Design a protein with these regions (language model features):
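N-terminal periplasmic "start-of-domain" segments of outer-membrane beta-barrel proteins
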Residues: 31-61, 89
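Extracytoplasmic beta-strand/coil segments of soluble accessory domains associated
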Residues: 71-108
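A beta-strand signature from Gram-negative outer-membrane beta-barrel systems
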Residues: 124-171
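Residues on the lipid-exposed face of transmembrane beta-strands in outer-membrane beta-barrel proteins
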Residues: 186-190, 237-243, 285-291, 336-342
Length: 375
């Protein structure tokens, strides 16, 4: 009797297990049809690592100059000599600042005196994009000089863009901060015709550079002093004309920068004041023209003239601890470039570029060699 009940219960259990297993298998074996998803993307032609800041990201940065924005890139070393009024350079992959090419609207900035570009004099108020390459630019269609950089920084200024109901844009800003910083700026963009527009950007920077510090004297009392001769007066102005043509564009840019600044130094013989001064004037005028002649041939022309002036003064009559130095440097540069691109196949382009550059450097130093260079 007990054995019959046992086998009946065992049979019912096996039947229920088989029923549940078949039900589970039916759920697992059911088919669900999903609609197809098509993913499209452009082929990335950047074969060299690139980092870029543009648009809203650039405007939201708590930065004043291009050097401050480049701090957000990886793999770079920023050298800042003296805050707002000091020289600011960048070092990419430990190649040195002399091997970094800085390009403003596609044309390289030069310095025949020491080969170093001060990034602190380029403001972000009129900047559209800042791009950094760990080498040359990936594009094949570029001037010959662009192929010879161990590291490249491309600064792209704003190009006016207007809505249909707008013929001009005006942007005024005012910034202030510690150490007596006053920084107003104005940007005006005007639509001259359907294909021609103009822009004017001005900026003024002033700071006293004064701040308190503690000076300890051996065998005496600590003294609270104020750093002096750290003031900066800087004016930047640039204007541009922009034109659109069929399958191309042209643009012309004029840039002017003038500054006077003091150089504070160490406390020597209990003297807290330093009278070293420096005056800088930088001007350049450049033009670019680009046009595609069908799908086979493209032409790019660049031209530039630059003039740079530097005056450094250290007067021992005002500061006994210094040697008299009164040096002036004047340099000029002329640059011409022509790039040609021929498209043989969709996957094969040929670029032929030729550049010419003339540099001249003068100074008031004794036995100065007065270098000239044609490249």
């Amino acid at each position: 009797m007990f054995g019959q009940i046992y086998f009946r219960v065992l049979g019912i259990g096996c039947f229920l297990s088989m029923a549940l297993l078949s039900s589970a298998q039916s759920k697992l074996d059911s088919l669900h049809h999903l609609n197809e998803v098509v993913v499209t993307a452009r082929i990335n032609k950047e074969v060299i690592p690139v980092q870029s800041l543009s648009g809203d990201k650039l405007e939201k940065l708590a930065a004043h100059s291009v050097a401050d924005a480049i701090r957000y890139f990886s793999g770079v070393q920023i050298k800042d000599y003296g805050g707002i009024g000091g020289l600011k350079t960048v070092n990419i992959r430990s190649m040195g600042t002399n091997h970094v090419g800085v390009y403003y609207d596609g044309i390289e900035l030069g310095n025949a005196q020491n080969g170093v570009i001060d990034l602190g004099r380029f403001s972000l108020d009129n900047m559209e994009a800042v791009t950094l390459y760990n080498g040359q630019k990936s594009a094949i269609f570029q001037p010959a000089k662009d192929f010879g950089s161990a590291g490249s920084i491309y600064l792209q200024s704003r190009t006016p863009v207007f809505r249909e109901d707008r013929a001009y844009h005006v942007k005024a800003t005012f910034k202030t901060g510690s150490f007596g910083v006053v920084n107003p700026s104005l940007l005006w963009e005007q639509k001259l015709s359907e294909n021609v527009s103009a822009s004017l950007s001005t900026e003024y920077m002033y700071t006293t550079g004064k701040y308190k510090f503690t000076y300890a004297v051996d065998g005496g009392y600590d003294t609270t002093a104020v750093r002096r001769n750290g003031d900066v007066n800087a004016l930047r102005a640039e204007g541009g004309l922009y034109g659109k043509i069929k399958s191309g564009y042209w643009r012309t840019k004029a840039y002017f920068y003038n500054s006077e600044r003091g150089y504070p130094g160490a406390v020597v013989r209990n003297r807290f004041s330093h009278e070293d001064r420096q005056w800088d004037t930088n001007f350049f005028f450049q033009s670019s023209f680009k046009k595609d002649f069908g799908d086979v041939y493209s032409l790019l022309l660049n031209a530039k003239y630059a003039y740079d002036y530097l005056h450094y003064l250290a007067d021992p009559q005002k500061e006994e601890a210094t040697m008299y130095v009164n040096n002036t440097y004047r340099q000029q540069e002329v640059y011409l470039s022509m790039a040609n691109r021929v498209t043989l196949f969709p996957f094969w382009d040929i670029n032929i570029s030729a550049d010419y550059q003339w540099n001249k450097l003068n100074a008031n130093l004794t036995d100065f060699p007065y270098p000239r260079r044609n490249t």
